[in-house]
């Protein structure tokens, strides 16, 4: 833990997501060429828009950079956030961040604070409801229903269903070069780097998904 202060003009807040297709036990990762032309892999992330909720911003960035619509997934993760008043009991499932990064931004004194969330691809019915034209404003999905179990969620997809991938969702020239891949958890960890934060996010997310299955 550290103590630091940043004025509004030096602080940037963002969010990222590990997007899981639970039925096939796969996760979305992105790739792009580095300065030497070699491919590197990453999870979708980015700055939230002014006035935007951090969770919505993470879902939106996940969609824009990967092309997969997604929604945050409530999981039995441990956290230290207080419950809303009146505090009758603690809900066993929350969609709180599973990781936080602090990184310098550029070469100045600006600080980037990034929150990592766990999300899922959307069921076919929601994809139809949220369908928009290329270049249209982002349409956020409804939250994951509190009463929907993971097993019932999986049953909402026909056997062998492939999550819908949208083309042209990047909002700038750099994002237009991104490619997305739906890969196994093991492959994602290998490509993201076993000691990197993004690999940790995937590991944490998959562990908590299995924990929720066990609870149900």
Placement of each model-derived feature along the sequence:
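Active-site beta-strand termini and strand-to-loop segments that position acidic
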Residues: 19-23, 32, 119-121
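Nudix hydrolase/Nudix homology domain
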Residues: 36-40, 110, 114-116, 120-216
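A conserved hydrophobic position in a structured secondary element of the catalytic/binding core
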Residues: 20, 43, 183
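Acidic pyrophosphate-coordinating catalytic loop
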Residues: 79-113, 124-125
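Short, P/G- and charge-enriched loop/turn segments at secondary-structure junctions
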Residues: 1-7, 94-107, 166-169
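Conserved beta-strand and immediately adjacent loop positions that scaffold enzyme active sites
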Residues: 16, 26, 179
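Conserved Nudix-box catalytic region and its N-terminal flanking loop in Nudix hydrolases
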Residues: 23-87
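Acidic, metal-coordinating catalytic segment for phosphate/diphosphate chemistry
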Residues: 1-16, 20
């Amino acid at each position: 833990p550290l103590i630091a202060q940043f004025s509004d003009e030096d602080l940037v807040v963002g969010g990222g997501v590990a997007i899981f297709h639970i039925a096939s036990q796969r996760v979305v990762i992105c790739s792009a060429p580095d300065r030497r032309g070699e491919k590197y892999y990453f999870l979708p992330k980015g700055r939230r828009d002014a006035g935007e909720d951090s969770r919505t911003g993470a879902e939106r960035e996940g969609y824009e950079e990967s092309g997969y619509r997604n929604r945050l997934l409530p999981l039995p993760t441990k956290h230290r956030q207080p419950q809303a008043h009146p505090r009758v009991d603690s809900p066993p499932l929350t969609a709180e961040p599973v990781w936080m990064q602090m990184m310098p931004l550029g070469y100045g004194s600006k600080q980037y604070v990034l929150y990592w969330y766990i999300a899922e691809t959307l069921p076919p019915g929601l994809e139809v409801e949220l369908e928009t034209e290329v270049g249209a404003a982002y349409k956020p999905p409804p939250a994951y229903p509190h009463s929907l179990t993971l097993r019932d969620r999986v049953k909402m997809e026909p056997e062998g269903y492939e999550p819908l991938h949208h083309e042209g969702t990047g909002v700038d020239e750099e994002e237009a070069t991104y490619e997305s891949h739906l890969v196994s958890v093991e492959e994602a960890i290998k490509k993201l780097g076993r000691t990197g934060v993004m690999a940790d996010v995937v590991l944490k997310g998959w562990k908590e998904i299995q924990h929720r299955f066990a609870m149900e």
